[in-house]
């Protein structure tokens, strides 16, 4: 069995926008649950506009995608929104195949994601 480093999630806020950086595999089990709890806490503390940077995750599965969809729905219900940052590669391919890029605005950079708000 291959052990993978734990998912690391951090956030920073500037001008009402919350930037979330994720490092590690966003897959079923602890990683997806960790992200979900982190995001629920962020929303409960008032975050409404969130940019999630996925550039440092090498892999995402359906559980990770589900966590992002739930966050998007939660923010929309609060009058906010979710934007994703994801460059080319396996994760962007997964987001495209699942059509998540059509449901959640996805950009190549944080600057572009910010301009999308």
Model region roles, listed by residue range:
Residues 1, 9-11, 74, 96:
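Short secondary-structure boundary/capping segments
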Residues 3-37:
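STAS-typified acidic loop motif
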Residues 25-104:
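Amphipathic alpha-helical interaction surfaces in cytosolic regulatory modules
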Residues 89, 111-112:
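Acidic phosphotransfer microenvironment of two-component signaling modules
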Residues 105-109:
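Short acidic-hydrophobic, aromatic-tinged amphipathic segments that line or gate anion-handling sites
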Residues 116-117:
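A short, charged, amphipathic alpha-helix used as a generic interaction element across diverse proteins
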